[in-house]
Every structure is written in C-alpha cells, then in structure tokens.
A protein has these predicted regions:
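Short, well-structured N-terminal submotif of metal-dependent ribonuclease cores
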Residues: 1-32, 42-58, 78, 130-132
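Generic structural signal for small/hydrophobic residues in well-ordered secondary structure
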Residues: 3-4, 40, 76, 101, ...
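Alpha-helix capping/helix-boundary segments
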Residues: 6-7, 36, 72, 97, ...
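Active-site neighborhoods of divalent-metal-dependent phosphate/nucleic-acid chemistry enzymes
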Residues: 54, 64-109
Length: 132
C-alpha cells in the first residue's frame, strides 16, 4: 500500500526510481488507501493546477484505491490509544492510513518512516529514492 508521500513522489517524478521499482511488480500488488487518495486530490485542488489535478487523476486511475472498512476501525482505536499512551502520536491522516494497511496485513510503502515506524505491528518500508 502506497502512502501519500509515495504517491506524491510518483506525481513529481513519474519516471523515477520509485516508479521503476513499482513497475517491476504485478499491477494488483500495488494499491493505496482512499485516505491517501483524498489527501492527494485535496492537495491538487488546493493548488488550483489543472495539470497537477490531471496527473493525480491519471495515477489514481492506474491504481487500486481500497475503501476504508472494518476492521480498520479496530486497528485505528488500538494504534491511537497505544501511541497516545506512549506520548508518540502521529498525524490523523497517517493514523488512518496505518490502520488501513495494518488491518489488511499489507506493507506500507512510505517516505515517512519516522512517523510510521512508531506504529506497532505495521510493516513499513521506504524504498530508495535514487538508484545506487
């Protein structure tokens, strides 16, 4: 599952390393959360850029956008309670995305490891942004 930062990178650099790495996977192995799609669409609309909005729509049309459903709500409650008790909360959108990915047993691909690594039981990766 791709988070908002990974999607944003694909928008900014559609021929980049991340896009190439994702291109080597089966198409049905790559998806995103409706929460990330909401964030991406909002960002494009807020900027008022027709070309950016078009790139966002093209990317989301090419991906499976998963609806937020049960048991993500249970994971959300558990994650939020745990992180708040530990004094290490994460942003509200990231919390929903983390709960969504964890509830489906998916690995979350992000450029925001610092935030998501705090979530217990969430498999998270950050693929290199550039070739080595």
């Amino acid at each position: 599952m791709l988070d908002t930062k990974a999607l944003s990178e694909l928008i900014r650099n559609p021929g980049g390393t991340l896009a190439q790495q994702l291109g080597s996977l089966e198409p049905d192995a790559v998806c995103t959360s409706i929460v990330a799609a909401c964030e991406l669409r909002f960002g494009a609309l807020r900027k008022g850029s027709a070309p950016l909005t078009q790139r966002v729509e093209q990317l989301l049309d090419a991906l499976t956008v998963l609806p937020l459903d049960s048991p993500a709500d249970e994971h959300y409650a558990d994650i939020r309670t745990t992180l708040e008790r530990n004094g290490t909360p994460i942003g509200s959108h990231d919390l929903f995305i983390a709960a969504h990915a964890r509830s489906r047993g998916m690995t979350l691909l992000t450029r925001n490891l610092r935030e998501f690594q705090r979530v217990p039981g969430l498999h998270v990766e950050d693929w290199p942004a550039t070739s080595t």
